[in-house]
């Protein structure tokens, strides 16, 4: 989904969903494929809830949790950052690409603390401390999502320490605080920007709630969770009425898409086995297997392709959808698949452990590890 969104960076502006021809409508939808991020946060919440549940009564459970998360995220991130820095460095030598690609980041464009923030996935909040709150500076536009992920993992680890078998209650307490801040308007305070309490925890919590509803809740608890997710979806959609700017719509659409996806997980659970064996879902298994690698490596090539075609005048709705988008998918696969084989797979915890980790998700979506 994010490949589609990033391929649209230089396409002609679309006014509204029904303001033009079919290409216009498709571009309007494609420019909102960033909803893959809130959906990814829901999947992450579901998986982490499963991990916490499986480890909460085991000796050394916290250590296992931390090791898995560290090796899953950081070594591939470091290699991807090195690749992106090299790609930007080469692209910067081209006057043509330097003129048209706004995403290029030279090595000197980031301070030492910003490099540390990118490599540790802390840049979303580290700038408050070391850059006087001037705002984050990302080497790649996808790193901000990992900054939130690491915060989610940290909070989940604290839940494991403080509550053990009652970790879900800890997540409920954090969710209540996050919801109160959001409803009161305090979540949008500049001082909270980049922290999990700026509203993004809610997206993660939807996944945790879905896992609890499916695996642990009694009927009354399941009904309460479904009701809360449904209410959130409806309220977010109603809040979007009359809004046209992406800024105004962004978080309401994030809430609506995340809550509705969590609802889908709960509702579709009885058919997991059937869906996982359906011929229609089989291609997603191959894509999902390498999705984190594609996620980490697609940003630079896709934005360069989009900028290059825009630079020669091919930025219409038709040319972007018919030429730029297919090339973006191809480039993402050509870079992401070798990255998976050579880098990510080396840091996996083995086939048996990977299969166990995948089982934290309903079978029908288990292959989808990251938005792509």
Report each predicted region and the residues it spans.
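Membrane-interface helix-loop-helix regions
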Residues: 21-25, 29, 73-148, 256-269
